[in-house]
């Protein structure tokens, strides 16, 4: 497709050249980064529980594979770039393990991996100098209950799962995310807030706005 508005043509399932699919990580919530060094696909779902059919699946966390230029042939084996529930203990991800919602961006010399954590209200991020990671956990960008902002320990409103990503617009950076309305997990409202990228590349947690 030549424009983001579509219409899209189905190219095929993401598989190895022989048609097989790596049996590590849950193929869920994908994100793509394409640059001169290659095409990178990030994916993953890392719950503290197992759905039927997932009992024996190895789920280290957020996974990454390289794709051929056809964008659906896997040319590298999966590697874990951010620790999930099963592997976070003893790492910087221990309090905020990867859950789902992979999002990848590059600003300046840094690659930013944004994800929804096991805490079920926040978008966290890790940083790496390479798209292949691993991404060093750096903190929370936004909580849809403002938990953690300026020391808040209690939610300021109904909160729940969060998805989103970073965008640069006219030299400024924003986090797009969603909050929950009407006190229900399925009433979700898209939101955007400006973020500040500090000299060392880190992003302080922001207060959610209306």
Name every feature range the model reports, one short phrase each.
Residues 1-210:
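Carbohydrate-active catalytic/glycan-binding domains of CAZyme proteins
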């Amino acid at each position: 497709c030549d424009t983001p508005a579509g219409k899209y043509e189905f190219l095929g399932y993401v598989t190895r050249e022989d048609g097989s699919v790596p049996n590590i990580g849950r193929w869920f919530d994908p994100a793509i980064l394409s640059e001169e060094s290659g095409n990178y696909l990030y994916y993953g779902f890392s719950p503290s529980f197992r759905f039927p059919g997932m009992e024996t699946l190895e789920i280290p966390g957020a996974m990454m594979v390289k794709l051929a230029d056809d964008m659906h042939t896997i040319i590298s084996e999966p590697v874990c770039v951010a620790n999930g529930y099963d592997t976070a203990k003893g790492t910087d991800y221990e309090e905020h393990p990867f859950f789902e919602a992979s999002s990848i961006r590059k600003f300046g010399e840094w690659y930013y991996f944004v994800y929804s954590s096991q805490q079920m209200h926040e978008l966290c991020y890790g940083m790496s100098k390479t798209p292949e990671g691993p991404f060093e956990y750096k903190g929370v960008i936004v909580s849809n209950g403002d938990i953690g902002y300026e020391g808040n320990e209690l939610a300021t409103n109904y909160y729940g799962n969060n998805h989103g990503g970073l965008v640069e617009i006219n030299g400024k950076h924003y986090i797009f995310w969603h909050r929950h309305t009407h006190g229900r997990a399925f009433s979700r409202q898209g939101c955007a807030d400006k973020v500040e990228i500090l000299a060392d590349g880190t992003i302080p947690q922001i207060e959610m706005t209306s």
